[in-house]
Regions:
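Helix-start (N-cap) detector for alpha-helical repeat units in TPR-like alpha-solenoids
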Residues: 40, 74-75, 108
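Conserved structural position within tetratricopeptide repeats
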Residues: 65-68, 102
Length: 122
């Protein structure tokens, strides 16, 4: 990789015989990051909307897709825990709430602890 400052003071880099202005590379990286963020937020919003509409199975599908692509998404784990809770699936709900809390969002785990949702009923 070779750097060159031209007379117009625009930095360019040479790679494999091609010359690209650095601004185009930065713009491309920014656009890719923006697309990823928009996709992430779209899946999250869709999951939230389905949960609010009491369509827990469909919301769960969207949140599963979100967490498959972005496994460290704290709010995704929290919301998926809520979906499992409303579907009366206590163990997966507790697992997701714990994971969300490990990632910094402890609303679900606080609820589960206060309401004793995640304790064995024995």
């Amino acid at each position: 990789m070779v750097w060159n400052i031209s007379l117009s003071r625009q930095s360019r880099f040479f790679l494999g015989g091609l010359c690209w202005p650095i601004t185009l590379l930065a713009q491309s990286a920014f656009q890719e990051e923006a697309r990823s963020y928009n996709h992430e937020q779209s899946l999250l919003r869709q999951g939230q909307a389905y949960l609010r509409a009491h369509r827990y199975e469909v919301g769960l599908e969207k949140l599963n897709q979100l967490l498959l692509e972005f496994p460290e998404h704290a709010q995704g784990h929290y919301l998926r825990g809520n979906a499992y809770y409303y579907l009366k699936q206590r163990e997966p709900a507790c697992t997701d709430w714990r994971k969300a809390c490990d990632l910094g969002q402890c609303y679900g785990w606080t609820f589960a602890t206060f309401e004793r949702v995640c304790e064995d009923p024995s």
